[in-house]
């Protein structure tokens, strides 16, 4: 999403605001051109919202002052409203994955739930899915309890609880806890594959298959 592309590089808040607004419009225009060139039923657009997710934790002393949600509110309809209805659009709420580590560890899923409720209800078009990360060591009720506060209608939820380190068994353990608060969801890796060691990709894919089987097992 726009702030994730801009805010790391412009540390003066005034500069960041000016560039963000221009970049947001440019990104929306680029997405429209993609939609003109690619058959709509072959296209899925996933907004990667990293800065938008971690900025609330006040990690960066150059982050603009004020309510971060106000900035998210300004960009949310602009980037998605012009996308044709036939195109699938979703959000990945990201805490970063450099060196297999987050910028900050999420306390629980409350921030992801808050952001999900906001983007689904304020994008000006249908949002088909949201993705939320789950650290490997979180199989406690406190992490998943905020899922009860989701207000996103029929939007799909994917929990990034699949990790190659503990495979399908670890995913199943986390699934069982999450289902106490959200009975139906899909599963995914915690973040993208782009920075992974290639040797870990096949074990992670196998873990996905085993986790998916766990979802369909009573």
Labelled PLM ranges:
Residues 18-31, 65-79, 106-118, 140-147, ...:
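Well-ordered, non-membrane alpha-helical segments in soluble/globular domains
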Residues 1-72:
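Active-site-proximal, glycine-rich beta->alpha crossover segments in alpha/beta enzymes
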């Amino acid at each position: 999403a726009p702030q994730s592309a801009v805010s790391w590089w412009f540390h003066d808040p005034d500069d960041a605001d000016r560039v963000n607004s221009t970049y947001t419009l440019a990104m929306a225009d680029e997405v429209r051109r993609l939609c003109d060139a690619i058959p709509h039923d072959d296209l899925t657009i996933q907004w990667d919202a990293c800065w938008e997710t971690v900025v609330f934790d006040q990690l960066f002393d150059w982050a603009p002052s004020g309510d971060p949600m106000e900035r998210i509110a300004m960009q949310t309809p602009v980037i998605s409203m012009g996308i044709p209805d036939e195109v699938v659009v979703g959000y990945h709420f990201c805490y970063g994955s450099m060196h297999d580590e987050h910028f900050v560890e999420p306390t629980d899923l409350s921030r992801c739930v808050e952001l999900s409720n906001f983007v689904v209800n304020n994008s000006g078009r249908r949002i088909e899915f949201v993705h939320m990360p789950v650290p490997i060591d979180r199989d406690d009720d406190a992490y998943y309890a905020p899922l009860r506060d989701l207000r996103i209608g029929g939007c799909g939820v994917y929990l990034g609880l699949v990790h190659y380190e503990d495979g399908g068994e670890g995913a199943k353990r986390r699934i069982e806890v999450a289902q106490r608060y959200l009975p139906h969801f899909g599963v995914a890796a915690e973040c993208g594959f782009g920075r992974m060691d290639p040797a870990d990709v096949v074990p992670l894919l196998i873990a996905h298959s085993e986790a998916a089987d766990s979802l369909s097992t009573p």
